[in-house]
């Protein structure tokens, strides 16, 4: 049984409407979409974080487009398609690391605002924490949960109490969809979310003016 058919089989436990809704939630809350939303919301509501449109475009390119390039790249690289979903995840991890590292270097060399640098540090350290947990400690953490929790935590930081309820609702929907589709266990989702929280906390210590 292929990985795709196994995944489909696990979804058959849910009603068709429930599974379809869960797939839609996961599709619209992929990490690149969330960081894109984060950057656009901040650009139009906290304009002082950005020195100009160029800072926004660089942020979108490095935090959104570079990670997204992993998917077409997997189809272009010889033999990579045969590695299945696991190979796609590994390539996505590499592209995330490349994009987030480049964003951090861009921020350090161009002296972006403290708020924008906090975002760059959070994304860079989130990959480092996931690498430590998944590859070194062998404690499986959901990269999807980490990629969702990160921008939601940042939104709560920038908007205070006003951001907590909507962000909590989004994260609850993501958890529900992942559990419904059996993509992750509750423990993997929790560890992934805590990874984002740890990365954000470390970033506060590093990037605070």
Predicted regions and their residues:
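Core segments of transmembrane alpha-helices
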Residues: 34-36, 94-106, 125-126, 145-151, ...
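The first (N-terminal) embedded transmembrane alpha-helix
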Residues: 25-45
């Amino acid at each position: 049984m292929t990985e795709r058919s196994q995944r489909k089989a696990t979804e058959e436990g849910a009603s068709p409407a429930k599974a379809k809704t869960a797939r839609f939630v996961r599709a619209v809350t992929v990490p690149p979409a969330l960081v894109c939303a984060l950057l656009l919301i901040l650009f139009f509501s906290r304009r002082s974080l950005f020195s100009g449109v160029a800072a926004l475009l660089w942020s979108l390119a490095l935090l959104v487009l570079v990670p997204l390039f992993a998917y077409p790249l997997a189809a272009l690289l010889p033999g990579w398609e045969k590695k299945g979903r696991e190979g796609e995840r590994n390539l996505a991890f590499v592209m995330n690391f490349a994009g987030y590292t480049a964003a951090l270097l861009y921020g350090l060399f161009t002296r972006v605002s403290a708020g924008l640098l906090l975002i760059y540090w959070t994304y860079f350290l989130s990959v480092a924490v996931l690498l430590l947990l998944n590859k070194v400690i062998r404690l499986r953490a959901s990269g999807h949960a980490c990629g969702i929790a990160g921008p939601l935590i940042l939104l709560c930081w920038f908007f205070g109490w006003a951001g907590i309820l909507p962000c909590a609702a989004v994260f609850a929907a993501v958890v529900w969809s992942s559990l419904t589709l059996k993509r992750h266990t509750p423990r993997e989702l929790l560890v992934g979310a805590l990874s984002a929280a740890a990365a954000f906390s470390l970033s506060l210590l590093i990037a605070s003016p």
